């Protein structure tokens, strides 16, 4: 029996596990997973590829062609006629995406794409900063994930070690704290928890435990009983 479709928004700081957890929830309930940050990464990738400076929002906007960025209903990100979903994960793109994401006009472009995409559709789970109050303000279920910076840095270090990436814990911690500062202090749509979001502190819980907690919230929302203990 298929699950009833609702829309879910998951917010929280960098490195808290939003993507991993949202993907597991999406797979469990057969929902479509969208990483909203991938659109900012795609713009950063486009600028890098076309040698467009990101130091000035006004100048950058001039070089972005109309309708150059889109999503499909498998959650893939497209730049014009190219699926770039698997090309967006490197340190430079991450760094540039954090800069680009502070620009009001860029955030407006991305938000419009995401809102048009979800219009009249259910069964979508979106994760990303400002998802709960700007991108999906009418989501049926809103989750705000949290973990202290040190815990997030340890998780990132473990992940990098698994991927055979040489990284220093202090460098990771410093980068996470800097990203938190940028996200919390930016003028346009800063990182914050909304009144109607459910706060889950993941610091002392495993990923599977958090997935289980969120699953129970989803079951409750869709009016079905969970068999999970």
From Swiss-Prot:
Is-annotated flag, keyword Nucleotide-binding?
Answer: yes
Give the E.C. number(s): 2.7.4.25
Q: Which GO terms describe its molecular function?
A: ATP binding; CMP kinase activity; dCMP kinase activity
Q: Which residues bind ATP?
A: 12-20
Q: What class of enzyme is it?
A: transferase
Cellular compartment(s): Cytoplasm
Query: GO:BP terms for this protein?
Result: pyrimidine nucleotide metabolic process
Keyword annotations of the record: ATP-binding, Cytoplasm, Kinase, Nucleotide-binding, Transferase
Main location class: cytoplasm
Q: Which GO terms describe its cellular component?
A: cytoplasm
Q: What catalytic reaction does the record list? A: CMP + ATP = CDP + ADP; dCMP + ATP = dCDP + ADP
Q: Which NCBIfam families match?
A: cmk (TIGR00017)
Q: Which family does it belong to?
A: Belongs to the cytidylate kinase family. Type 1 subfamily.
What this protein is called in its record is: Cytidylate kinase
Specify the species.
Mesomycoplasma hyopneumoniae (strain 7448)
Gene name of the encoded protein: cmk
């Amino acid at each position: 029996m298929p699950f009833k479709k609702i829309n879910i928004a998951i917010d929280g700081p960098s490195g808290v596990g939003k993507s991993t957890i949202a993907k597991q929830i999406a797979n469990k309930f057969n929902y479509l997973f969208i990483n909203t940050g991938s659109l900012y990464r795609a713009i950063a990738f486009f600028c890098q590829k076309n040698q467009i400076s990101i130091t000035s929002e006004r100048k950058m906007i001039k070089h972005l062609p109309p309708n150059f960025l889109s999503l499909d209903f498998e959650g893939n990100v497209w730049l014009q006629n190219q699926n770039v979903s698997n090309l967006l994960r490197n340190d430079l793109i991450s760094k540039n995406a954090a800069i680009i994401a502070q620009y009001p006009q860029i955030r407006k472009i991305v938000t419009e794409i995401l809102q048009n995409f979800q219009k009249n559709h259910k069964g979508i789970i979106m994760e990303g900063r400002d998802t709960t109050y700007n991108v999906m303000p009418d989501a049926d279920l809103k989750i705000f994930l949290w973990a202290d910076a040190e815990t997030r840095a340890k998780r990132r270090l473990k992940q990098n070690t698994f991927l055979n990436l040489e990284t220093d814990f202090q460098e990771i911690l410093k980068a996470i704290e800097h990203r938190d500062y940028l996200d919390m202090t930016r003028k346009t749509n800063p990182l914050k928890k909304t009144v109607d979001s459910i706060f889950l502190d993941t610091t002392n819980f495993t990923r599977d435990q958090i997935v289980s907690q969120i699953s129970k919230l989803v079951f409750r929302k869709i009016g079905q009983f969970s068999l999970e203990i």
